[in-house]
Amino acid sequence: MQLGTLLAATTFSGAAALAPLLQQDVFVAGQGGYHIYRIPALIVTSNLTLLAFCEGRKHSRSDTGDIDLLLKRSTDCGKIWSEPQVVWDDGPNTCGNPCPVVDETTGTVWLLLTHNPGDTGEAQIKAGKTGATRTVWLSHSEVNGKTWAPPVDITATTKDPAWGWYATGPGVGIQIQHGPHRGRLVVPCDYSFQSADRAGSAPAVEGGSHIIYSDDHGQTWKLGGTVSPQMNECQVVELSDGAGALLLNMRNTTKANCRAQSLSHDGGQTWTVPDFPPELVEPRCQASILRYDWPNGKEPARLLFSNPASPRRWDLTVRLSRDDGKTWPVSKTLHEGPAAYSCLAVLPDKTIACLYECGRTNAYEKITFARFPIAWLEESE
């Protein structure tokens, strides 16, 4: 086992904390044969193992090129991490956008991924200037991430043929806990499409968010509803109404300068017109949203959210909502300075974990794991 760079059992910058907080660098640029590590995803398995996924980019920071899908495991809530494990390496091609989801009935970890030729970039695929496209893949582990099945192509049932670019997550999927779709596995994704001609001009490239889902414990996957245009990377969370309502939280290219949110009351088949909560400021970046707990008759249920709360990719911030995402009255800075993508998890002892991109001079120097009690967050009220 490998002990990562332990920054501290210490306090985070900002305010005095109630308890020691752990920060640990899990992936560091330039180490392990990779130029840089990006796109973190973090999930807890049925036997309480932590899985930290990311992309290992061999030669540059580019989203295109030789990119492998990597994993580290921890069995002690993030104190010690395994050596990196290569989940998928397809030579010079791009294997990425990890989005794991745990089936709580079977214990299987399903890992949704995307693939494209390493010499073909996002702009080319969006513009339709290449015969290549972005495809959707699925792997799984029945042993809590120790080994993985070879990825299989599920593009035919999860992507509209008219779409160009496609991304699973990044982040995590969920399993619906209540209502008529209880047990459904839901994975948030995004896609690009070419809009119709406008006044004789060439078609414009637009973006949308959507979900894919499985009702048979991951054996088959189907395409769910979409939200478009001007939507992008997204994450999904179940609301506390007891009927399985879903909230889709989306990066977007509007001028709102904040996140977009849309609701579904039919398991992700259809979505409402999005609204734009002004509290969730963002620089057009990925974000994470997660349920911390369910209503217990005494206290309201809580949601967690993390992203760079800035007009630029800066100041990774964690927020808390007690009204299913309508308002976010509690917030605290987890990392001051450059920061980008992140992924939240709730650990077995109910402490909160966050795996996030950060650095001193740019946001992509390392992927860091942080762990803290919810009291650390709520003391900022």
Regions found by a protein language model. Name each.
Residues 17-381:
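Asp-box/BNR beta-propeller blade signature and adjacent active/binding-site loops
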